From Swiss-Prot:
Gene Ontology CC entries for this record: ribonucleoprotein complex; ribosome
Any one GO MF annotation of this record: rRNA binding
Role according to the record: Binds to the 23S rRNA.
HAMAP family membership: Ribosomal_bL9
Name of the molecule in the record: Large ribosomal subunit protein bL9
Keywords assigned by UniProt, alphabetized: Ribonucleoprotein, Ribosomal protein, RNA-binding, rRNA-binding
Length: 149
């Protein structure tokens, strides 16, 4: 019996491979546990189409992320905060505040706070470079200018 593996199976093969197995193993374990499907031409073609569609979708998402990084690199986000006598801020600037200000000043950029990498909260005025990880190995930076109110 030939089956198309839907996921990696130890000692048999990887997802997407067509394997020859005994009828009992194929029906009672692989197909019953949805680890494989009976390998007909229709099933194989459908699986290949799904894989191709998924790859195209990922390529499109990666291109959008790369375009977002290019836009981010041109941005300097200005944040006005109250400052004490020694130049330190009252409170700190966190990921949440950065994403809120980005949405206010640049509505086209849709970043989530989990995308922003802050090693520590910003507690004083100055210009800071913020790293953004958008997935698919896409990493970018933008600048934040913290000024006294």
């Amino acid at each position: 019996m030939k089956v198309l593996l839907l996921e990696d199976v130890k000692n048999l093969g990887k997802a997407g491979e067509v394997c020859e197995v005994k009828d009992g193993y194929g029906n009672n374990f692989l197909i019953a546990n949805q680890k494989a499907k009976l390998a007909t031409n229709e099933v194989i073609n459908k699986y290949k189409a799904e894989v191709k569609k998924k790859a195209e979708k990922e390529a499109l998402e990666k291109a959008q992320k790369l375009q977002m990084v290019e836009t981010l690199q041109t941005i300097t986000l200005t944040i006005h905060k109250k400052v004490g006598a020694n130049g330190s801020l009252f409170g700190a600037i966190t990921k949440e505040e950065i994403t809120e200000r980005l949405k206010e000043q640049h509505a086209s950029l849709n970043l989530d706070k989990k995308d922003i990498e802050l090693k520590h909260p910003i507690k004083s005025t100055g210009i800071y470079e913020i790293e953004v990880k958008l997935g698919f190995g896409v990493v970018g930076t933008f600048k934040i200018d913290v000024v006294a109110e």
